[in-house]
């Protein structure tokens, strides 16, 4: 039997944003000092680098340890909404870049204005399910609801043209199963997959542009996402032989993933080389 015939088929529609993701350089650039950020990107533009997709990171929403997801108001210490709106216009209208926010519907902090325990998934012991540090895992079904509710508000405020939707493709669907018997699809990974897939489609609709995510388990979502970090840390690619057939024959036709991300995504469990 031919090896490639055994590869699973990803039954998602191809991305309709490959003309952007495939022709532009992608960069995650978390908000710091907005005037300094503008000088940095103006210098990039001055050097002739024009086809660029820039997605902000969670620092656009927080100044310290406050909530960074399920937000419609940006970090006050960075100038708040007025500064974020002006920066969005500078990146897109002045420089001609594709620019958008960080968002995430997988991590939810108790200090968030929308917080309620009824939004949080339950584990098999019926306890609140933990997620990222200081966060709990939102119910996938409710995550869809809030994506559909909040994304248009942010788009009306800031006029983005892309977004980074963190974590959704980093975790496996079976790692975020909601065991709350009150929800449809309780105890099933399918409920997670369909919810996260719908979130990606809602993202594209909201920004009228490509949506990116974190990768590692992105094969399930390619096509629904337009790009991801092309990483597979659990395989430990710095230590094991590369079998690229699945990536090239199944994933590449659906979306445009980028590189290996940060070097520690490639050197997942071994020290990075200090010289070349």
Task: Report each predicted region and the residues it spans.
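Active-site neighborhood of glycoside hydrolase catalytic domains
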Residues: 139-214, 219
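Carbohydrate-recognition beta-sandwich/jelly-roll modules
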Residues: 1-66, 72-78, 90-99, 103-105, ...
């Amino acid at each position: 039997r031919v090896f490639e015939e055994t590869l699973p088929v990803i039954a998602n529609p191809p991305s309709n944003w490959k003309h952007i993701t495939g022709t532009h350089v992608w960069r995650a650039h978390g908000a710091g000092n907005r005037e300094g950020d503008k000088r940095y990107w103006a210098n990039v533009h001055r050097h002739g680098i024009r086809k660029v997709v820039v997605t902000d990171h969670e620092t656009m929403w927080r100044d310290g340890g406050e909530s960074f997801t399920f937000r419609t108001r940006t970090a006050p210490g960075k100038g708040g909404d007025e500064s974020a709106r002006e920066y969005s216009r500078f990146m897109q209208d002045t420089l001609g870049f594709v620019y958008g926010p960080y968002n995430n519907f997988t991590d939810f902090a108790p200090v968030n204005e929308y917080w309620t325990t009824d939004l949080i998934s339950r584990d098999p012991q019926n306890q609140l399910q933990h997620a990222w540090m200081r966060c709990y895992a939102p119910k996938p079904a409710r995550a869809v609801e809030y994506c559909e509710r909040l994304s248009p508000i942010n788009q009306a405020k800031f006029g983005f043209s892309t977004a980074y939707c963190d974590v959704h493709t980093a975790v496996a669907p079976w790692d975020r199963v909601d065991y709350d018997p009150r929800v449809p699809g309780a105890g099933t990974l399918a409920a997670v997959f369909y919810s996260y897939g719908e979130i990606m489609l809602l993202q594209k609709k909201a920004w009228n542009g490509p949506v990116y995510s974190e990768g590692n388990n992105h094969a399930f979502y390619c096509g629904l996402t337009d790009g991801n970090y092309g990483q597979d840390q659990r395989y430990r690619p710095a230590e094991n032989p590369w079998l690229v057939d699945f990536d090239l024959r199944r994933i590449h036709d659906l979306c445009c993933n980028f590189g290996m991300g940060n070097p520690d995504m490639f050197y997942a469990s071994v020290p990075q080389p200090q010289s070349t």
